[in-house]
């Protein structure tokens, strides 16, 4: 879907086998740094590629990328306004109701009752769209992954 919307010149990293989100991101970030020479202060956006989206989505991705580069935040998330209390999504609880806000709490796939409470507090669904500076994820990867242990690679 991404090539049909953006053309063949866009760079896409595909994980060689399923190892969950963080290892896939680390693989992509390592490729960007080691193969393409991307600087560690460069903002990177992570997003699902399966949905068909409108042009406004890409404008929002650019704003997210800009915010990651300018704000000094380690991670910038894009939330989705919930339409019902779901146990299938993570919830982002923002500090304020502004379009841009610090996150006070994040809860992954809560019970329906907890989701109702979060929505009442102005929570947003985590849509899996976020941005960060490349160096931040490299630093976290080296803190969390033992790159000398074969079973972790």
Task: Tell what function each PLM region has.
Residues 1-46, 52-59:
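Conserved N-terminal catalytic core of the sugar/cofactor nucleotidyltransferase
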Residues 8-9, 40-42, 70-75, 87-88, ...:
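Short coil/turn connectors at secondary-structure junctions
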Residues 18-23, 83-86, 112-113:
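A short acidic, often aromatic-flanked loop/helix-cap motif at beta-alpha or helix-coil junctions
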Residues 40, 56-59, 87-91, 142-143:
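Short acidic, glycine/serine/threonine-rich loops at helix termini
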Residues 45-48, 77-81, 107, 131:
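Short beta-strand segments
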Residues 52-87:
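Conserved donor-nucleotide/metal-binding helix-loop-beta segment in metal-dependent transferases, i.e.
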Residues 91-153:
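Catalytic core of tubulin tyrosine ligase-like
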């Amino acid at each position: 879907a991404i090539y049909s919307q953006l053309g063949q010149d866009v760079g896409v990293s595909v994980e060689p086998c399923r190892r969950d989100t963080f290892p896939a991101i680390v693989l992509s970030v390592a490729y960007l740094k080691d193969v393409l020479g991307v600087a560690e202060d460069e903002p990177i956006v992570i997003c699902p590629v399966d949905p068909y989206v409108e042009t406004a989505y890409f404008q929002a991705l650019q704003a997210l990328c800009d915010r990651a580069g300018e704000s000094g935040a380690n991670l910038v998330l894009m939330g989705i306004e919930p339409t019902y209390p779901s146990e299938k999504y993570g919830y982002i609880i923002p500090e304020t109701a502004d379009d841009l806000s610090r996150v006070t709490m994040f809860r992954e796939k809560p019970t329906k009752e907890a989701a109702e409470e979060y929505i009442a507090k102005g929570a947003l669904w985590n849509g899996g769209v976020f941005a960060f500076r490349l160096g931040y994820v490299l630093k976290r990867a080296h803190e969390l992954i033992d790159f000398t242990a074969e079973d972790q690679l």
